[in-house]
Design a protein with these regions (language model features):
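Conserved alpha-helical positions within TPR/SEL1-like repeat arrays
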Residues: 58-66, 92-106, 131-148, 157, ...
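Short coil/turn linkers that connect adjacent helices within long alpha-helical scaffolds
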Residues: 46-48, 86-89, 123-129, 163-169, ...
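TPR/TPR-like (Sel1-like) alpha-helical repeat modules
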Residues: 317-318, 322, 334, 338-341, ...
Length: 361
């Protein structure tokens, strides 16, 4: 083992927080046993302590990233990088830079994501590591997408896909194809986006990876929704929400139910929309998610109103009004009162409409 190699005694999988992207499966060694570099005894001891401390900081930074402590993670990882640079450990510099890129991406600092990823790629020219390379390319592609530089994003993700195919790494192919779908969708090239996303779905189904299927199905649904192809969007969202329920991903299911309700409303299928919104309302209350609860009540009121069921619409709008007053949200209260005013008038109850108009109820 050379002085730059680490002992992969324990591996951690990088965690990606962004809900609409699938990161590559990237195993990170935790820097166990290392062979000391040649030199005097004093120099060897100094380097050993540097490496040991740097390794601990890297592990600490990874743990902080996984716990969502992003500022602390950046601090730990930057310190680790300086120490690995001081002893000339190239492989560990690559790994730290890859983590710094991930933490920056998770923090929505896309320029820093690009900076660290490009530094990582520069080191990879002399010390190749395909697993780290696909991660760096993935971060670059996704970061450029967020900066609306779709051409650059596509270039990096195409290179990422090429390497994953060369490695026959199917899980990483799923991520690369999915992320290419996202950048093509952002660029308005919906047909191309669907082509990549469906290829990603085929592989993830073959792998029987429910978590991956949930992500890919949601993204295909979103692309069809952007195309105003609501029946296809509904079909993919329904498959997706079944998996979210299976995995007990309650927050994900809540968001999908919102999308399903919106797509059903777009096709004037208000009865079905109400079923989805009612389920979302139950989940919102289970999660104690006030914002989702008020959105669900508003959506339910709208859907009932569209069906001409004004009494039921008023019930939901009144619940929204009570919630707005409970959390002292003036804007929400004004919206609820306006909805109640309009619905009462539609019902012919002008006296009650006047009371809502004046805010007396």
């Amino acid at each position: 083992m050379s002085k730059h190699e680490s002992n992969p005694s324990l591996k951690k999988t990088l965690k990606q927080i962004k809900p609409d992207k699938i990161t590559h499966q990237f195993d990170q060694s935790t820097l166990g046993e290392m062979v000391l570099p040649q030199g005097s005894v004093a120099s060897e001891q100094h380097s050993y302590h540097k490496l040991s401390e740097a390794s601990q900081l890297l592990e600490q930074g990874v743990k902080q990233q996984q716990d969502g402590e992003l500022i602390a993670a950046l601090k730990s990882l930057k310190q680790a990088l300086q120490m690995f640079q001081a002893v000339g450990n190239i492989e560990q510099q690559q790994q730290v830079l890859c983590f710094l890129s991930l933490v920056s991406y998770t923090s929505s600092d896309y320029k820093s994501t690009i900076y660290y990823s490009q530094q990582c790629l520069a080191l990879l020219q002399s010390h190749p590591d395909l697993s780290i390379q696909i991660q760096a390319l993935s971060h670059l592609g996704n970061a450029y997408r967020h900066l609306n530089d779709y051409k650059q994003g596509i270039n990096y993700l195409q290179e990422c896909l090429r390497i994953t195919r060369e490695m026959s790494n199917k899980r990483s192919q799923v991520a690369a194809l999915n992320n290419l779908g996202l950048v093509y969708k952002a660029a308005g090239q919906f047909a191309k986006a669907i082509e990549y996303q469906k290829e990603s779905l085929e592989i993830v189904e073959e792998l029987q990876d429910n978590w991956g299927m949930e992500q890919v199905l949601k993204n295909i649904g979103n692309t069809y929704y952007a195309l105003d192809n609501y029946p296809e969007a509904i079909a993919y969202y329904e498959r997706c929400v079944r998996i979210a329920r299976l995995l007990n991903h309650i927050r994900s299911a809540s968001k999908l139910l919102k999308n399903l309700g919106s797509a059903c409303c777009a096709t004037s299928n208000y009865g079905k929309a109400i079923l989805y919104y009612e389920e979302r309302l139950q989940l919102a209350r289970q999660l104690e998610d006030i914002r989702s609860e008020e959105q669900s009540l508003s959506s339910l009121g709208f859907a009932c109103e569209a069906l001409g069921d004004y009494k039921k619409a008023i019930k939901y709008y009144e619940e929204r009004l009570l919630l707005a007053r409970k959390i002292q949200d003036v804007r929400m209260e004004e919206q609820a009162l306006a909805s109640l005013d309009f619905t009462c008038k539609a019902l012919g109850d002008y006296a009650k409409a006047m009371q809502y108009q004046q805010g007396n109820l």
